[in-house]
Design a protein with these regions (language model features):
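Charged DNA-binding/catalytic regions of mobile-element recombinases
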Residues: 1-199
Length: 199
């Protein structure tokens, strides 16, 4: 993917404790993405960290990464996966907006620089108020309900397999009322059919 010549202005919500922000409402795919990190315990290993990038319009998880340390590399791996899945040709008709919290990893100089290189506009939630990233937070809760809370993982391999299987199921088969009962992949297919018919 060619990245030369791409630039973007970095935008953030002001970090004020009393400030509230409503969640942006996307009107098409690749307009608003959300990213976030969670962790869960693996016996004999410790905490395992998960970072995801999700398209708010299609509800598709575009990228995810697992690691033993909550480093910026983990966030970048999920981000690069998302770009490769959503924009395999390396081009977009307009910029993507990426919503995150104010954590040290997504606000690091390294992460911000990569976003600028990819022409992705970074927006952060207001201080101590994750409402702006509500769709991403909602997915993380679904992940915990479906994968983390019902299970006790005994190894990294077991945890990784469960995560991989869930994301495959979620994207291909998990129905959403906001998508007219379709899964993210099926909804994307319907969008493609509509665009083809209109061409």
């Amino acid at each position: 993917m060619r990245l030369d010549g791409l630039s973007v202005s970095v935008k953030r919500y002001k970090a004020k404790r009393a400030e509230t922000r409503s969640k942006p409402q996307p009107t098409h795919r690749n307009e608003w993405w959300g990213t976030d990190m969670t962790k869960f315990y693996v016996h004999g290993l410790g905490w395992l960290y998960l970072v995801i990038v999700i398209d708010w319009y299609t509800k598709r998880v575009l990228g995810y990464s697992l690691g033993l340390r909550p480093k910026t590399d983990l966030w970048l791996e999920a981000l690069h996966q998302a770009v490769e899945v959503a924009c395999p040709a390396g081009s977009r008709s307009e910029d993507v907006h990426l919503m995150s919290d104010n954590g040290s990893q997504p606000t690091s100089t390294r992460y911000e620089t990569i976003l600028e290189t990819l022409s992705i506009e970074h927006v952060t939630t207001s201080y101590n108020n994750p409402k702006g990233n509500a769709d991403t937070e909602r997915f993380m809760r679904t992940f915990k309900e479906e994968v983390v809370w019902p299970n006790e993982f005994e190894s990294l391999e077991e945890a990784t397999r469960a995560v991989d299987e869930f994301f495959l199921f979620y994207n291909q088969d998990y129905p959403h009322s906001t998508l007219m009962g379709m899964s993210p992949i099926d909804f994307e297919a319907s969008l493609n059919q509509t665009q083809t018919a209109a061409a």
